Design a protein with these regions (language model features):
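Flexible "arm" and connector segments at domain edges
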Residues: 1-68, 72-116
């Protein structure tokens, strides 16, 4: 990933504006947003279905971009609906993961933290 900003506040604001202009917030309960995230994640997974591990990047990049964008957009809307600050919750999760997966135990291992 580039060392640029992950996501500009302007982009987050555009997502919320798009939703609000259509008066869709009334339909965006945490349950329905979680379902939508799961469905869009499944569509992202479908991009890889029946493909070899070494064939994905260039051939499927456009579909990957669209489906990943959908997952992220719904994630932004869920955070907004639940009053969560994206930067704060991501930083908190990184701290928790660092505790679960200390470098000295997790480096070069793919196992879950309970198996390290």
């Amino acid at each position: 990933m580039r060392k640029e900003t992950f996501m500009k506040q302007e982009t987050i604001d555009q997502v919320i504006k798009f939703r609000d202009e259509r008066n869709w917030k009334q339909f965006h309960t945490p349950k329905d947003l979680a379902i939508s995230i799961s469905l869009e994640a499944a569509e992202l997974l479908e991009v890889f279905q029946w493909s070899r591990d070494d064939v994905w990047c260039e051939e499927k990049m456009e579909n990957m971009r669209e489906e990943l964008a959908d997952v992220l957009i719904y994630g932004i809307m869920m955070a907004d609906t639940c009053g969560m600050n994206l930067d704060e919750i991501i930083q908190e999760k990184i701290r928790k993961n660092a505790e679960k997966y200390p470098v000295e135990k997790a480096r070069d291992h793919k196992e879950k933290y309970t198996e390290l």
